[in-house]
Each structure stands twice: as C-alpha cells, then as structure tokens.
A protein has these predicted regions:
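Feature captures the catalytic cores and cofactor-binding loops of soluble hydro-lyases/lyases
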Residues: 1-120, 134-202
C-alpha cells in the first residue's frame, strides 16, 4: 500500500454535536478528489480506550470505491470474515464487536498513530511488516535503496553460509555490513519538512 495521507482525528464514545453522523464522512470522501492522490485514510482515535469498532464491511467497501489506497488507524475494526476478501489494506489496533457514534473531529491535520507522527500529504507505505512514512525528497530513490540494503545484508548472510564460522568472522561481517548501511544513511539523510496543507474541520 502506498499513497498520500489524509489524516484526521476521530471519536465514537459520544455522539457528535450535530445530528448527522455521516456529514464528516461526506467531507472526507469529497477530499479524496483533491491532490495529492491517491489518499491513504489515516485516523487517530481520541477515545482511550477505544469504545467501538470503527470500520466494518460498509467502510471497507466505501473507501476503495472512492479511490483510497488503504487505512492506517489506531481505531478498531469488525466484520473480519467479510472484509478479508475485499483487498483493501487496513492497519488497525485490533477488533471489537461493537458499534458506536463514529465521527471525525478534525480533518487534514497532523495525527499520531502508534507513535508515528503523520502529516497531511505524507507519503505513506504499508505492508506485512507494518507502516512508515517516506520523505518526499527521497521517495524516488527508495526502490534502489531497498536493493542496496538487501545487498549489504547479504554480507552477513553469505558469511553464515560458509562451512566454518567463528564469532570473530561474524563480527567482521557485521561491521562490514554496518559500514555499508552507514554510508547509505549518510547519502540519504535529509532534513524532514512536512508537506504543507491547511488543516480544516469536517
């Protein structure tokens, strides 16, 4: 999963101030059409602990239909047996069999999800290993860098395939790998400047 963060804050433990629970979802879907795209839905749950499941079959079907690439959230989900085959990647904090008063508080604002600060328009990536953000300045280099990291790690892996190994030999291979990775890090290090996008309410 890769796309541009559309981060929002969220609650479900109490009803919203307005009667229409779906107004904020309407605004969210409209924002999908704004650049940059495609969007990654990013929600910080302000309820502690989580009071209800935020996402089930309906939302898992709605978001990709409007162009979203995935979901990153500290909220919970439900309908696991139904959403598994939908192909929409979602990174959540678990599951809960409960409905709630789901509504967005603020949209397009910086959020924190499981220790990751995510700004509006951050390039977000997720796979089986988890979620991260990628600075725009180095995004075009990521495919090549992944290859170089894997190549550096083969120094250790190749040593371990030798008929005889020693702690001294392993340490030498580890140091060689570490130096290769350090050189790569020095080459890529940039000052991270969040993409600017004005925050707004739903």
């Amino acid at each position: 999963m890769a796309g541009y963060a559309l981060p929002s804050t969220f609650r479900s433990i109490t009803p919203p101030c307005e009667e229409n629970l779906y107004r904020s979802i309407h605004a969210q879907l409209e924002a999908f059409a704004e650049p940059p795209s495609p969007p990654v839905i990013t929600l910080q749950n302000l309820d502690d602990p989580c009071a209800s499941a935020t996402f089930g079959e309906i939302m898992y079907s709605t978001y990709p239909r409007f162009g979203a690439q995935g979901l990153i959230t500290s909220c919970l989900r439900r309908n696991l047996q139904h959403v598994e085959g939908l192909g929409f990647l979602a990174f959540t904090n678990g599951a809960l069999a409960a409905h709630g008063y789901c509504h967005i508080i603020l949209m397009n604002v910086p959020v924190t999800v499981d220790g990751i600060i995510i700004y509006p328009s951050d390039l977000s990536h997720g796979d089986w290993n988890g979620v991260t953000t990628i600075p725009h300045q180095i995004a075009s280099e990521v495919p090549q860098v992944c290859h170089e990291i894997a190549e550096a790690e083969t120094i250790i892996l190749n040593y371990l395939k030798q008929p005889t190994v020693t702690a001294t030999g392993f340490n030498a291979a580890r140091q060689e790998c570490g130096e290769a990775l350090s050189q790569l890090g020095r080459r890529l290090r940039v000052e991270y400047v969040p993409a600017t996008r004005v925050g707004r309410g739903p």
